[in-house]
């Protein structure tokens, strides 16, 4: 009996010691700087918003949360970084909607549904199409008429091929029966510089153009949400104009697969609290971004459903990779 009791005690001790490193890690997390990857260039709307979120989360977690920019490839480089990162909670990323689309268009180094932990969704974008204030095109109706007379001559920039600003305009163009010329850039900053410099006729992007619209330097032709924005309430949506195109692209915080659930909860709760930070509320208002909160289970469900839905969109637009 004594031998059996000693055996049970020893096996229990071994099991506890095996769990101890993980328990100890979650109990003390975080103990060093957390990297939060922004898959867009510094200076763009997403970069600015993420820096405010990072600063707010850092105060809550009592550590530094730094932004590391990995621009290019339509915003999927954050996902590529997470695949090779340790699942310890110290490497996080923003995974834009392009991670649900690009794998249907070309080969990627990650599996969208199996390589990531969807920690929390925080917000989404307001997208819009803008032209220089001196452009002869003053409305979507005029754009459609001009494009029908000049096929493939109307140039518009986006932050990357397969991004929401790209596919929303492609879907609009398909439904309007027009052909436009797409110019992809490595993020919003380059996209904005191109339209201001006269290198493109229009810019399709999130609201990095907002202050210039308010200042009278750019004209907002339409937004892509399910309803009009509060900030530009006089501007109709593409959906409202009859083109059945809606895009808001929720995003938040993601990590590598196989993360410790306790660490996931710590990160989830910290970033959830940022949504009540006046600085975060103010930056969302500046870029007219709504709060779109989803917990880990909801965000994971959203990822699965969106991956399937985006395949249908890519196929409908004739962009599906059949290799």
Regions found by a protein language model. Give the residues of each.
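An extracytoplasmic/periplasmic, membrane-proximal ligand-sensing/linker region
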Residues: 31-33, 174-178, 259-323
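Hinge/capping helix and adjacent helix->loop/strand transition within the periplasmic-binding protein
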Residues: 84-90, 104-190, 238, 248-283
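Short coil/turn segments
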Residues: 43, 97, 132-137, 158-163, ...
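C-terminal lobe and pocket-closing loops
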Residues: 124, 209-276, 305-308, 322
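N-terminal (or domain-start) structured segment
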Residues: 25-115, 153, 161, 178-204, ...
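N-terminal secretory signal peptides and thylakoid transit peptides that target proteins
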Residues: 1-14
């Amino acid at each position: 009996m004594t031998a059996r009791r000693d055996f049970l005690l020893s096996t229990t001790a071994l099991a506890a010691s095996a769990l101890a490193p993980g328990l100890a890690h979650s109990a003390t997390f975080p103990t060093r700087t957390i990297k939060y990857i922004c898959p867009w260039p510094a200076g763009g709307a997403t970069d600015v918003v993420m820096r405010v979120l990072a600063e707010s989360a850092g105060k809550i977690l009592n550590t530094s949360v730094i932004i590391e920019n990995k621009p290019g490839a339509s915003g999927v480089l954050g996902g590529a970084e997470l695949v090779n990162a340790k699942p310890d909670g110290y490497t996080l990323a923003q995974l834009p909607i392009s991670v649900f689309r690009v794998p249907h268009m070309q080969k990627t180094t990650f599996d969208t549904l199996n390589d990531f932990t969807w920690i929390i969704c925080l917000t989404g974008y307001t997208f819009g199409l803008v032209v220089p204030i001196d452009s002869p095109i003053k409305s979507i109706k005029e754009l459609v008429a001009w494009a029908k007379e000049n096929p493939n001559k109307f140039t518009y920039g986006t932050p990357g091929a397969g991004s929401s600003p790209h596919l929303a305009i492609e879907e609009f163009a398909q439904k309007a029966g027009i052909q436009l010329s797409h110019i992809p850039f490595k993020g919003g900053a380059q996209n904005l510089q191109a339209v201001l410099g006269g290198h493109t006729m229009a810019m399709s992007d999130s609201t990095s153009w907002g202050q210039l619209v308010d200042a009278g330097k750019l004209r907002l032709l339409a937004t892509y949400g399910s309803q009009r924005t509060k900030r530009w309430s006089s501007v109709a949506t593409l959906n409202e104009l009859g083109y059945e195109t809606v895009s808001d692209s929720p995003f938040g915080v993601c990590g590598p697969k196989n993360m410790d659930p306790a660490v996931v909860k710590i990160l989830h709760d910290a970033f959830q609290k940022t949504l009540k930070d006046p600085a975060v509320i103010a930056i969302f208002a500046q870029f007219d971004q709504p709060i779109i909160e989803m917990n880990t289970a909801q965000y994971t469900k959203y990822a699965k459903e969106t991956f399937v839905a985006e395949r249908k969109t890519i196929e409908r637009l004739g962009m599906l990779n059949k290799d």
